[in-house]
Amino acid sequence: MLENIRSDFFLKFLCQHIKDKDKILRLFQYNKCLQKKVKLSINDYRNKYYQTIIGIKPGETKSNIRENVFIRISRNCYNNYHIYFNDDKTEIKRNYLEHNEKIGKIKVFIDYQVKSLKALFLYCNVEKIYFIKYNRKDITDMSLMFYGCHSLFNLDISKLNTENVRYMNLMFGNCKCLKNLNISNFRTEKVEKMNLLFQGCSSLEKLDISNFNTNNVTNMMGMFSFCSNLKKLDLSKFKTNKVTNMVGLFENCYSLQKLNLSNFKTEEVTNMSYMFSFCTSLKFLDISNFRTNKVTNMKYMFNHCESLVNLKIPKKFEICKDNSLGIFTNCCEELKEKIKKEKNLDEKIFDDRLCGFSFDHYRSELFNDEGKSEYIPFFLRLNSCYGAFNTYELINWKDPTKLKIL
């Protein structure tokens, strides 16, 4: 008999329908790929897994579960387990939610007690996700929710209520196969962190976020970085009065041709490094409304904006003295000449030959195996002596040596 804790309806249902004297269930810890075996007897539904079970439909087996999974998310996402039926006592070597085994479709139902959906599908190799029967208002954290879902191409989140969400950082990060994303239902008035929100969505062709309320956002680092297929972004309704971090905001948006930043307020921003780096298709940019008096880092801000010939900057465009290396590195000569005529600036901001090596990396909060919060790098940027930039993705956050060039 298992530890006596309050009964769970789902387990009660299972136990009452056990035909054999006892049954071995395989429980997979959802986001850690760990396996546990649990022995249940008839009417034995009082156990330590109360409200930490992700259920599947009764009768589903290994043969069909990969095509259509139904999961029930309970109170604490970090301790959820997935029930897997197995009549014999052989060990199941792999979790079917691992990166290298695709799942066709997942339907999700979320319990009322849930407060956080952080890292819910982290690195889950799934193609389709649908949320059903869900309109809870008390979710506060959706960070890393779909991060690293490289195979995901169909995502229905129209039932998600984001009314009280405060954290959306890395929510869709590295969803490389997503071409369309409908988030017109999102309410974001309470969101504080949007850093790396769409980072690495390299297949995304259109993105309508005209409904976004960004009044309380403080961090927009890398929000659209590596969205290499996006051709235009209308951010004219964005309120950025509280934002302090705009590092790499549009970095590596190679296809971006139109960018409306007319409503951007940057009085509180302290870091603009790499902000437009490698926006190679951008020809016109108006940042005449920018205020940079608090900015302490502008390194490589317009690096490799090779097509940019028309840049409107404010009359009082203050460039920080200490971290201004390569602001206009590898920009077209026409733009460089215009900037030189308008302002008396240090030549290092135009320098195409960068001395030495430096390492920058985006960092985001994640939970390690012990459930403790820690900071880990997701991306590592290597700047060479000749203005060449290689950006690497960290394949395995447990082993920082495993890198893949992007």
Model-derived features: positions:
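N-terminal capping/linker segments that flank leucine-rich repeat
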Residues: 1-139, 312-406
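Canonical position 11/12 of the leucine-rich repeat
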Residues: 125-128, 138-139, 150-154, 162, ...
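Hydrophobic anchor residues at the C-terminal helix/turn of individual leucine-rich repeat
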Residues: 4, 110-111, 120-121, 131-136, ...
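Core hydrophobic positions of leucine-rich repeats
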Residues: 116-123, 140-150, 166-176, 192-201, ...
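Canonical leucine-rich repeat
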Residues: 92-93, 106, 117, 129, ...
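A general, composition-driven signal for non-globular sequence regions
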Residues: 1, 17, 29, 152, ...
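Positively charged, low-complexity intrinsically disordered regions
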Residues: 200, 232, 258, 292, ...
